[in-house]
């Protein structure tokens, strides 16, 4: 069997005997209240932690063994309402009281007293701890005690140590979170100048306000006139467009089309004049009983009448 296992089996976990207490006191006076590993070697079955806890909680001259006073009870209740089960923090507020003694006193007496009497555990009376962390709190004794020597430091009640860590892991600790206050800043009463959004073309004077909705007519939107209403046309351009349309209607067709028509008419007229000349020649030779016109008289007359009608309608007299 290994040495660590043998040592664990030889550990004594029961209460301390008076002989062990006397030996511990002598060893602390000899080696000081800090050399717990060295002290534990002289006490069979006791570890350094066990020696330290026995000294700090019971054998130290700074530890008070008297009953808790009413003032101490009120201080514990106020501190517990603020810090919860942070017994080491609360013990710094009471001289001569250990965190273990305060915890036992709370669980055995004060907790039941608050639940039975229906107290809120938050006294507003005189005496005890008033919850003001700004004031100087009583000095906490050193962890090892020893002749009432103080560390010379004011420990903050908010710093966890010792039994605070073990109590926080138990699940019954009260958690106090700061409350964030939201402050609403007053907005300026001055109104901003109105903002305008123009939906018209640059040369128009019509403007539409942002905060005023655009009124749309369903018929107008369906007919495709929505763009015309949002983008009005200048009167000058509208007049020019109307004049161009009027010219187009009065002048007939475009220039290219008119050129083609004129060429067709010119060709037709030349053909017509050639037919007339051939008709005249045919008329002069008809007296000799020779030939006649190249086409029948009825067809020639109809063709001549059609050509004369075209020439008269267009108004062309003579074309080269």
From Swiss-Prot:
Residues 158-171 have a biased composition (Polar residues). Residues 132-173 are annotated as: Disordered. Induction: Induced by salt stress. Residues 8-63, 65-114 form the HTH myb-type domain. It is found in: Nucleus. GO terms for cellular component: nucleus. It comes from the Eukaryota. SMART domains: SANT. Coiled coil: none annotated. Disruption phenotype: No visible phenotype under normal growth conditions, but mutant seedlings exhibit increased survival rate upon salt stress. Keywords: DNA-binding, Nucleus, Repeat, Transcription, Transcription regulation. The keyword Transcription regulation applies. Transcription factor that functions in salt stress response. Acts as a negative regulator of NHX7/SOS1 and CBL4/SOS3 induction in response to salt stress. In response to auxin, activates the transcription of the auxin-responsive gene IAA19. The IAA19 transcription activation by MYB73 is enhanced by direct interaction between MYB73 and PYL8. This is Transcription factor MYB73.
